Amino acid sequence: MNKKIIISSFASLLFLSQAANAEIKIGKGSLTFNAGVNSQYIFRGIDQNKDAASPFVGADFSHPVGDFNLYLGAWTGAQDNVTGAGGQEIDYYAGVTKSFGPATFDIGYIIMTYPGAITKDIKEVSEYYGKLTIAPDKQPYTLGLAYYVDDTGGYKNSTTDIAGNYYEFNATYNFGPVQGLVSYGVWENETKTTTVSISKEIIGVGFTLSYISADKDGSLSSLYKDKEYVTLSAKKVF
């Protein structure tokens, strides 16, 4: 990976951390922006940027609607794992959240696009998703699960459709100095991924160090062998 790019990106984030919070109020809603860099962009156990650093930027809007909270967002980052993608991924998503005591439900839809992809079936991948997070009051932990349903028929490996639905179980724990996360996810016909992370905010920038273990889920997986990664990411919300 290009260490100069990583160091430069982290330095830029530290500079941004000195900026005032730029949250924009729009009626009862709010608009925020984020920027960051991943030392490697790993998505469900698969390297998305050929072992290179992946800078990213995004924007999120949220607004209360009755008893629900509506959110809309867009994100783009460096990506070089889709033929002809041109080094970029652009995602759009929308959903609603609702809390009942310690339980928060999140239902939404995400569209992941690769503008330069050479064939239609890999230009866009869309998914419905549902998430549940349990955060008991005054407790240092949360428990969560998520389920993503493919809405574009996956993509083809030779003549066979692969990459179906995805489900994940996760838990977080607040250790005080750092936050911990453990997750296990299965991407049907692709990967089974275990992630262990610790996170820490330093002068307004959130840093996350992760160990990721990805196993092939069948012979058609685009992961040619089981893989392990250690990644560092930094993200600033402003």
Task: Please provide the spans of the model-predicted regions.
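Outer-membrane beta-barrel proteins
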Residues: N2-S9, L13-F238
